[in-house]
Curated annotation (Swiss-Prot):
InterPro entries: CobS
Enzyme class: transferase
The protein, known as: Adenosylcobinamide-GDP ribazoletransferase
Family assignment from sequence similarity: Belongs to the CobS family.
Metabolic or biological pathway, per its Swiss-Prot or TrEMBL entry: Cofactor biosynthesis; adenosylcobalamin biosynthesis; adenosylcobalamin from cob(II)yrinate a,c-diamide: step 7/7
Keyword Transmembrane helix attributed: yes
Transmembrane intervals: 43-63, 66-86, 120-140, 146-166, 191-211, 242-262
Keyword terms of this UniProt record: Cell inner membrane, Cell membrane, Cobalamin biosynthesis, Magnesium, Membrane, Transferase, Transmembrane, Transmembrane helix
Gene name of this polypeptide: cobS
Record-level Gene Ontology MF annotations: adenosylcobinamide-GDP ribazoletransferase activity; cobalamin 5'-phosphate synthase activity
Length: 262
């Protein structure tokens, strides 16, 4: 394969990842199949970087003219519009399943139900409120830090979520599931590129903040995996969405705590 063909392949995989995780229209020549989607997992972090960057730009453009809370809300709205609430939906389904089911089979069945239950509604409401409050506090501390936090959290949280594919078992047998292609083994190349995207954005942060966030994310990933194994024996697309949302919130929390210490 020539260098030009290699670059074209990587661009194609990035666009496949962006088409899967966002509502941004893709060129007609971009075709996603199971193999491409599996390999495109290497670029899930970069998709988060794009979403976070656009959200941060909206925040930075409005924060001089609007109250911090409104600017943060607009930035969050941009993120939801770009992704279609894809990960938030996974969070709600996961909490409905984990909260309402007794056995792994019950939990998977409930998670498949498109209706929103009480556990999911509570999780979604609390997650959005937490993100808003943490970002407002970061904005009041320093608007530059708040915008950087959006970029970092959207990227790193997707790195944590997608890296679960590498070590864990996909537990759904439904061939029609949108996440079924992700059940294929994630190669070491996909994992390394994914990790590189997460580490790259840490350059937005000061040394102590970057190191603290990296260590917390490593521990959080392990904790999430333990919970998923105990609850359903592995992961599904919904639980990956939940992992992303949880990791994003923890990112904001860590950056706020470290910022106050500094």
């Amino acid at each position: 394969m020539s260098e030009r063909e290699s670059w074209h392949k990587e661009i194609d995989l990035f666009l496949v990842a962006m088409g899967y995780f966002t509502r941004i229209p893709m060129p007609k020549w971009v075709e996603a199949d199971s193999d491409k989607l599996n390999k495109a997992s290497r670029y899930f972090g970069l998709v988060g970087l794009l979403v976070g960057l656009l959200s941060a730009i909206v925040f930075w453009l409005t924060q001089n003219w609007l109250p911090a809370g409104v600017s943060v809300l607009l930035a969050m709205l941009v993120g939801v519009l770009l992704t279609g609430g894809f990960h938030e939906d996974g969070l709600a389904d996961t909490f409905d399943g984990f909260g309402g089911g007794w056995t792994a089979e019950d939990k998977l069945r409930i998670m498949k139900d498109s209706r929103l239950g009480s556990y999911g509604a509570l999780a979604l409401m609390l997650a959005l409120l937490l993100k808003w409050q943490l970002l407002v506090e970061l904005a009041l501390y320093d608007p530059v830090v708040a915008g950087s936090a959006l970029i970092v959290a959207h990227t790193v949280s997707r790195m944590v979520s997608a890296s679960i594919i590498f070590s864990e078992k996909y537990v759904r047998d439904d061939e029609t599931s949108k996440s079924k292609p992700l059940s294929q083994h994630q190669g070491i190349n996909e994992l390394l590129i994914l990790i590189a995207s997460g580490v790259l954005v840490l350059l937005f942060l000061k040394g102590l903040a970057a190191l603290s966030l990296l260590l917390v994310m490593i521990g959080l990933r392990r904790l999430i995996i333990v919970i998923f194994r105990r609850q359903i024996g592995g992961y599904t697309g919904d639980t990956l969405g939940a992992a992303q949302q949880i990791a994003e919130i923890v990112c904001y929390f860590v950056l706020l705590v470290v910022g106050n210490i500094l």
